[in-house]
């Protein structure tokens, strides 16, 4: 491989928007879909709706419980909603991050730029969450035990008809309160580990995989409390009996007005431990998901820049 391809890879943050859009979209789909079953486990463990999985000792036991009771495909309910939302959201997310990082650092790398990496991640998150929040609402309602919706489209239509557009953004401020620190920690950690493992900042699959996994796991663990609050706001449903069919189903109930209501309810029902529900499942989901996301992003960024270099 000639030096030209490497030079183009290093210069990407300053000008190659189409590359970042394409690589980011592919990375988003991989990140959210590959480990999706554990995201379903996390949602059920964090929600205050009735769910047998809250009594399981580990996320793996919870996943097997869902499969045993509801079938192999049940943990994948809602994956199409998150895939549809994550591709445009991540395309803009990575593009904005790279452009902001290049602007704030002058396209230089190093520990001295840690705050610039964090600030770039925050700006990217504001745009990402505005696109992703409606998909997150649909996804989490589809993931719930006893969810009455047959498809993600049906879920979106029912939420809109019963609760209005506001329902899709009820948890937006909470999502930002979680994702702003998450992404700041995530990007600062990723760039830190890249500087340690890959000081020349060349394309290096192993360093991207390791740095991505470590960064995602740390950020996920530290922001789990706000993730619990977000899940409670997104899954405001109550269990009701259906005597005719001898089953339980979930009916939408708008009970929590915002972050403070959700925090008080979680604490009153579960105590302080309620804010760490789903931590293991969240980390299990996030470590490989973030590792794969960065690996795919860096791979396609490199491939697309290399192709561009040869075609010019």
Curated annotation (Swiss-Prot):
State what protein this is by name.
Answer: Mitoferrin
Q: Which GO terms describe its molecular function?
A: ferrous iron transmembrane transporter activity
InterPro entries in UniProt: Mitochondrial_sb/sol_carrier, Mt_carrier_dom_sf
Q: Taxonomic classification, please? A: Eukaryota, Metazoa, Ecdysozoa, Nematoda, Chromadorea
Please tell me the species this chain comes from. Answer: Caenorhabditis elegans
Q: What does this protein do?
A: Mitochondrial iron transporter that mediates iron uptake. Probably required for heme synthesis of hemoproteins and Fe-S cluster assembly.
Q: How does it sit in the membrane?
A: Multi-pass membrane protein
Q: Which cysteines are joined by disulfide bonds?
A: none
Question: Which GO annotations describe the biological process of this protein?
Answer: iron import into the mitochondrion
**Pfam families noted in UniProt:** Mito_carr
What are the alphabetically sorted keywords of the record? Ion transport, Iron, Iron transport, Membrane, Mitochondrion, Mitochondrion inner membrane, Repeat, Transmembrane, Transmembrane helix, Transport
Solcar repeats: which residues?
15-103, 112-196, 203-303
Entry superkingdom? Eukaryota
Q: What gene does this protein come from?
A: mfn-1
Report, from the record, the phenotype seen after gene disruption.
Answer: RNAi-mediated knockdown results in smaller, but normally-proportioned animals that are paler and thinner as compared to wild-type, a reduced growth rate, slow movements with a 35% decrease in the number of body bends per 20 seconds, reduced brood size, increased lifespan and inceased sensitivity to the oxidative stress inducer paraquat. RNAi-mediated knockdown results in increased lifespan.
A GO cellular component annotation in the UniProt record: mitochondrial membrane
**Which family is this sequence assigned to?**
Belongs to the mitochondrial carrier (TC 2.A.29) family.
Q: Where, per UniProt, does this protein localize? A: Mitochondrion inner membrane
Where is the chain membrane-spanning? 17-36, 78-97, 113-133, 171-190, 205-224, 278-297
List the Gene3D superfamilies. Mitochondrial carrier domain (1.50.40.10)
